[in-house]
Amino acid sequence: MADPRVPSSYNVTPRIRYNTVGGVNGPLVILDNVKFPRYNEIVTLTLPDGTQRSGQVLEARGNRAVVQVFEGTSGIDVKKTKVEFTGESLKLGVSEDMLGRIFDGSGRAIDKGPKVLAEEYLDINGSPINPYAREYPQEMISTGISAIDTMNSIARGQKIPIFSAAGLPHNEIAAQICRQAGLVQRQGITNKGVHDGHEENFSIVFGAMGVNLETARFFTRDFEENGSLGRTTLFLNLANDPTIERIITPRLALTTAEYYAYQLEKHVLVILTDLSSYCDALREVSAAREEVPGRRGFPGYMYTDLSTIYERAGRVAGRNGSITQIPILTMPNDDITHPIPDLTGYITEGQIFVDRGLHNRGIYPPINVLPSLSRLMKSAIGEGMTRKDHGDVSNQLYAKYAIGRDAAAMKAVVGEEALSNEDKLSLEFLDKFERSFIAQGPYESRTIFESLDLAWSLLRIYRKDMLNRIPKKIIDEFYSRSAADRKGKGKDKPTTKDTRDTAAPEEENLIDA
């Protein structure tokens, strides 16, 4: 049976069949006496029982080739296994029909649906984008999460990772983003084409690497139950799947996203989890090739390899579509200096930090905004995009939250009696900020306008003269707004209400305070 990932036109080309497997080492097969092997060329291996596996040439040196086998090397007989070189790199058949479908880590459909009729076959390694053709990421993608939208806004075309750790709810956050993510239509826009700003033109590509069966079921069930599966394409590589398959899973997801963005002109959000599993697979292949290890055993080229994934986000001139990446990685031992988050931070444009301390206090989502950063936030917010007070409110929230954390640390040393009235006010803001602004229900979606109004209700704890990060004209316009005025702002915006009904009285109390 021919490999479904390789076009049928390649299968009729006469090929040389080799029976020269020299050895097997982990996920690698060493071939001897082969003619003109090429780097990244796809290889078909036929086992004695007739089953076929596919692999990719990792190293070609003279008449010797090293091949990584995607389905694993167990059961390969060195003397009886036959090998064919296809002459092509790995390609993925893409189509708009892939929306709403679930694939495994090798690109094969696993949802019992009909076969996808490919409209194009694209190289999974992508094509280099001319830097001059790249457009600066602008306009905001809404996640419905206040801590992200208000203080770490994500621009269309940005790449921003989520730094998490074992035992933290990064899977729940990823599922919530997939449920709630959408476009914030830029006000007054007339020259971006009919596609821009339309909700039906927003799609999600979700790639999971090395997840267990329970996590895979959680994502598929969640997407099916809330109705977001219709705009989502899933690639699932499970923990019991071959490790080497994790090398190609994110590339399959990004190839699909590039087709949606640049051919169908959709705005695509790509969520990849868990990049730590991907890097572990990279280390395993490097060890099998007996390469000189780098920091903590990871290969020295891991920075370059990660960049081939992250740099496929962005926008291209002449196309209305965009690719926004949110890769998720788990930091071993909560260590942000580990090579994986360290190198990721050099390539990407910020990070969203999931904090264990907030999680232990029962706050969901436990996003610590102080170490979090969005380097392209300034191009995604402001008048005409979100609201003119957005940037100033964000700066003031950062300042007051940092002061509140300092006051909490001082209270632990000297006690509450030694604190000044201003310190006690900062402690009050700290508690309400974490309990009512950062915290929200897993099925609660807040528009950016609702999040900004909630932020103002918190800032009213302070007198006007204490808000030193906001210009006076902004304070005069937004500080004294009544609750009725604020509630009328986001009526035309769709929201998913769950815990917001219980949060409304608390918001009124904050205004009174």
Curated annotation (Swiss-Prot):
Residues 484-513 are annotated as: Disordered. It comes from the Eukaryota. It is found in: Vacuole membrane. One of its GO terms (biological process) is vacuolar acidification. The keyword Cell division does not apply. Coiled coil: none annotated. Residues 504-513 have a biased composition (Acidic residues). GO terms for molecular function: ATP binding; proton-transporting ATPase activity, rotational mechanism. It holds the Pfam family ATP-synt_ab_N. One of its GO terms (cellular component) is vacuolar proton-transporting V-type ATPase, V1 domain. ATP binds at R375. The keyword Transport applies. Transmembrane segments: none annotated. CDD domains: ATP-synt_V_A-type_beta_C, ATP-synt_V_A-type_beta_N, V_A-ATPase_B. It is a peripheral membrane protein. Keywords: ATP-binding, Hydrogen ion transport, Ion transport, Membrane, Nucleotide-binding, Transport, Vacuole. Residues 484-503 have a biased composition (Basic and acidic residues). V-ATPase is a heteromultimeric enzyme composed of a peripheral catalytic V1 complex (components A to H) attached to an integral membrane V0 proton pore complex (components: a, c, c', c'', d, e, f and VOA1). Non-catalytic subunit of the V1 complex of vacuolar(H+)-ATPase (V-ATPase), a multisubunit enzyme composed of a peripheral complex (V1) that hydrolyzes ATP and a membrane integral complex (V0) that translocates protons. V-ATPase is responsible for acidifying and maintaining the pH of intracellular compartments. Belongs to the ATPase alpha/beta chains family. NCBIfam families: PRK04196.1, V-ATPase_V1_B. This is V-type proton ATPase subunit B. It comes from Neurospora crassa (strain ATCC 24698 / 74-OR23-1A / CBS 708.71 / DSM 1257 / FGSC 987).
